[in-house]
């Protein structure tokens, strides 16, 4: 092969191929093709010079140092120009026109395009355009032939591209140094410029951020202030592919105003309803409010930069004006800094939502939240009550305008902020606070209180462990709360008070001594129960007896704290009944066996029992918590005593 100009190859390409021993990259081919396309543009020579010098330096300074070949920048360059293509076609809609023309004028080429891009036959023009744009966004290698056929790079694109690359080259160093969190889950060994322009971009976040940076005009507003406000608006607005064109026009209009007047002056003097159309209205109001309190800018930005908050800190203003105890909390420097410090300490931005040490196996934050009115937190999701599982749900709760936010606000005001100001460790403070209430558990349950459910949540960390996804079924009845192990319909389910009783007998030494030789477990289905079970030999016959405890009255309702009942029975091993008659026969057989055995083991309580339809023995009375503990103790210890006496005979 002749490596000379007559073959279309120059020394630069020869050096690249010879030095690396590899074929030209996708970007090198694209660059060569673009050089030819811009040859008739008035800036053709400037393009080539800047591409090989200033722009190359910019890509080099922003390359991904974590990639396999950090000495190469071809990937960064390809993604960058493809991202510009995406912005160009989303804004102008030219690709739609090309597709429509291709469909009408060149049907065979249109079918070839459908086949190449894997487009369904019935797809409309917008769906086709979206498919191609998505291919570009992921830097899926598109042959130059199709870039040409689809007119993806018309002259107008190159006009947009040269201005864009020049803007990024000019602003990149300053932009990279800005103390602004841009919504990333993980920040690798890369620059801000790389993360919003030189890798796969998202329609809802990095593409609008890139457009905001490209749109910046020097004048009345600094780059930092411009990108801070844009960051806050973009990260807190749900942006779809359909929304992006109008938002780009909104940014175009607003940046012109900000080049003539300071952005904060504009926000202070504007009606939030009349500016920044298309962005989240709640966030616009927040930006207008923050612009009035620039003296607190440093702590506010610190909070905005937390991954959990991501620019949205409206709850800070709400907290500083709330009166949970009737006393006004003023917006002042000390309060803003204290609340900011606590919020960042509690919500550190990890995937779990809240700081792990506050939500470990002690679940201190959750238990503390349940101590303040309205004695619950979270939100309703899919017919379940959700106590926040993961970052998104905690965010939703913290930013809610529902009354349940008062639990968090009150916890900060009454407990955490005072501790923070005194430099007391927040975890230790929560532990001491929760334990002070928890140690009064039994006494508190004796009081008449329609919100007594909270004490079970406060006292037992195990309640939170059981709800692995922090879901429960909770209607308006505070005495009917069913804990779920997962989100699905087939989830295990345990009634709250029944499960709390299980935890007492499973882990509390005072309760464990009452069930010596008895196993304790749960039945998390249907009418859930805590069961006690013992195997033994009595009068030379082997038995397995059980006591099922549940929180239901005789009408199968739960109306008060005193709704405990139990079944006492021998575990039988009947086959499935083949008829109603056989079912009744099995029940009668079981009943006679139960009466016969328990009359000998615990005769003193037999008057407290009645027959159930299935042959088991059921408590006649409904018990209080103390009452059920007492009768359980009498039954288990009575049975133990009878077995011991029988063994001695």
Model-derived features with residue positions:
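Flexible coil/loop and intrinsically disordered segments
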Residues: 1-649
């Amino acid at each position: 092969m002749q490596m000379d100009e007559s073959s279309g190859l120059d020394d630069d390409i020869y050096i690249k191929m010879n030095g690396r021993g590899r074929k030209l990259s996708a970007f090198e081919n694209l660059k060569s093709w673009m050089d030819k396309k811009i040859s008739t543009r008035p800036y053709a020579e400037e393009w080539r010079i800047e591409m090989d010098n200033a722009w190359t330096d910019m890509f080099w300074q922003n390359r991904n140092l974590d990639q396999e070949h950090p000495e190469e920048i071809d990937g960064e360059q390809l993604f960058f120009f493809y991202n510009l293509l995406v912005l160009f076609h989303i804004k102008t809609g030219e690709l739609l026109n090309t597709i429509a023309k291709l469909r009408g004028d060149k049907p065979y080429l249109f079918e070839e395009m459908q086949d190449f891009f894997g487009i369904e036959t019935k797809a409309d023009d917008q769906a086709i355009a979206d498919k191609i744009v998505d291919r570009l966004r992921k830097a899926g290698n598109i042959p130059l032939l199709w870039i040409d056929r689809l007119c993806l790079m018309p002259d107008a694109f190159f006009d947009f591209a040269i201005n864009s690359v020049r803007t990024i080259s000019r602003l990149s160093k300053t932009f990279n140094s800005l103390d602004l969190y841009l919504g990333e889950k993980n920040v690798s060994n890369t620059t801000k410029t790389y993360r919003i322009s030189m890798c796969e971009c998202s329609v809802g976040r990095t593409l609008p951020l890139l457009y905001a940076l490209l749109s910046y005009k020097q004048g009345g507003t600094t780059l930092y202030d411009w990108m801070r406000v844009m960051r806050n608006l973009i990260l807190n607005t749900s942006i779809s592919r359909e929304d992006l064109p109008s938002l780009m026009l909104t940014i175009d209009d607003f940046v012109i105003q900000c080049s003539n007047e300071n952005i904060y002056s504009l926000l202070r003097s504007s009606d939030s309803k009349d500016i920044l159309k298309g962005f989240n209205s709640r966030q616009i109001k927040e930006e207008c409010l923050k612009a009035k309190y620039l003296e607190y800018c440093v702590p506010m930005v610190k909070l905005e930069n937390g991954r959990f908050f991501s620019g949205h800190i409206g709850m800070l203003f709400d907290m500083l004006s709330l009166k949970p105890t009737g006393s006004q909390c003023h917006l002042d420097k000390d309060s803003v800094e204290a609340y900011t410090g606590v919020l960042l300490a509690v919500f550190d931005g990890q995937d779990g939502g809240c700081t792990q040490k506050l939500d470990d196996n002690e679940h201190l934050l959750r238990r503390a939240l349940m101590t303040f009115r309205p004695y619950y937190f979270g939100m309703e999701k899919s017919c379940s009550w959700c106590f926040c599982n993961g970052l998104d749900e905690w965010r939703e709760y913290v930013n809610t305008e529902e009354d349940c936010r008062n639990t968090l606000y009150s916890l900060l005001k009454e407990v955490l902020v005072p501790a923070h100001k005194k430099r007391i460790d927040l975890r230790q403070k929560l532990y001491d606070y929760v334990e002070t209430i928890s140690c009064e558990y039994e006494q508190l349950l004796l009081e008449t209180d329609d919100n007594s459910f909270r004490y079970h949540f406060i006292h037992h960390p195990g309640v939170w462990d059981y709800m692995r996804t922090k879901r429960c079924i909770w209607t308006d009845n505070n005495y009917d709360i069913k804990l779920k192990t997962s989100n699905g319909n087939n989830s295990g389910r345990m009634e709250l008070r029944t499960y709390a009783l299980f935890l007492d007998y499973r882990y509390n030494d005072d309760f464990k001594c009452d069930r010596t030789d008895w196993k304790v477990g749960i039945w998390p289905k249907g009418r859930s129960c805590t069961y006690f079970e013992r195997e033994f030999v009595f009068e030379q016959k082997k038995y397995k007896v059980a006591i099922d405890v549940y929180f239901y009255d005789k009408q199968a309702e739960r109306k008060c704290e005193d709704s405990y009942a139990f079944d006492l029975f021998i575990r039988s091993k009947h086959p499935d009944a083949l008829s109603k008659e056989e079912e009744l026969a099995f029940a009668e057989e079981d009943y006679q066996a139960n009466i016969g055995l328990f009359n000998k083991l615990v005769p003193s309580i037999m008057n407290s029992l009645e027959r159930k339809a299935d042959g088991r023995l059921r408590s006649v009375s409904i018990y209080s918590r103390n009452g059920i503990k007492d009768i359980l103790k009498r039954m288990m210890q009575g049975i133990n005593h009878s077995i011991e006496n029988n063994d001695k005979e």
